[in-house]
């Protein structure tokens, strides 16, 4: 290189901006790498592998890394996600009773091509969006499936008022009431959607929701269309034991949040929900902003006051194990740990009365922590109980008759169970 060329190159290099500090293209992961990766089915190579490395002085490399962070689906954002990303529509179903007017709110993606309908019931203090990410994954595996995820009474956007509309009615979250609500919602959805008959149904309930769907399955009020039911992380024995410490747990929870983002952050940092994507869609439905907050710096409060539900706690879970084992239809119990099994269910498991699946890496909200795995288990569970795919073998008598006819035809003989009119017969 000539001296003239060298001096020209030095002059150009001197005008370039300072070298950008190096940083990894890999975005921050959720708080628990194992849960986060399995929740999305996405495996991100470790930074040490440097699969997309660029030279430190390369401006293109810096831009590439920036774009990767901005567009990567596993970003550490606490921005809320809308329900429309997971369901196709919402319904408001009005139920009139002697003392109240209830507006049930549900999220719906209708089934297609004779697909099944997964009816989802959340746990206490949660909402229908607790199943949002799981519903999305179910549809990826089984596109014809429908999802009906409800907001239970006094949860989410479901509201209960007196007949005059002047005030709220007394809180009633008894198992019997929640049972009637769920049956009404399914039937009213059928009417609203103009379905001539109900599609095949798989009931899915988490925690309190597990008790409700088991009660519905046991009483058979939705008829033979209920193929099966799945209970997520609740059994009678451990639930009754946990009630003793419920008040202490509630006293340790924050009562207010400065913003929705801080509410999402608390759920993920406390590991109440271990999947940030699910928290971003489900947590906003658990909170509402007070018009005149007592603490203006923290205007967001819980939509459902769990402490007020205490009178119903035992009513939800007493007799759950017995009903779960006795109800008609396929049975699935999905737990976050085998230590949750009580004696009755352990015996039932050894007798092969139900399917047991355990996700030890998940917390209590298994469908939120592990939506991909939960969806796969639920779809496989449906397929095992799908009557439309069942081909019954021919009866033994029919098989014997068919074999005899074939043998007689090959030998030119008359079938053993009938002779022609002109045939002779000796006793």
UniProtKB/Swiss-Prot annotation:
Entry keyword set: Hydrolase, Serine esterase
Pfam families per the UniProt record, alphabetical: Abhydrolase_6
InterPro entries per UniProt: AB_hydrolase_1, AB_hydrolase_fold, PPase_methylesterase_euk
Keyword flag Membrane: no
Cysteine-cysteine disulfides: none
Chain spans, region Disordered: 1-49, 402-427
Gene Ontology molecular function, alphabetical: protein C-terminal methylesterase activity
UniProt biased composition (Polar residues): 36-49
Catalytic activity as recorded in UniProt: [phosphatase 2A protein]-C-terminal L-leucine methyl ester + H2O = [phosphatase 2A protein]-C-terminal L-leucine + methanol + H(+)
Enzyme Commission code(s) on record: 3.1.1.89
Catalytic residues identified in the record: 207, 233, 364
Protein family: Belongs to the AB hydrolase superfamily.
General function of this protein: Demethylates proteins that have been reversibly carboxymethylated. Demethylates the phosphatase PP2A catalytic subunit.
This protein's name: Protein phosphatase methylesterase 1
Organism whose genome encodes this protein: Aspergillus oryzae (strain ATCC 42149 / RIB 40) (Yellow koji mold)
Protein encoded by which gene: ppe1
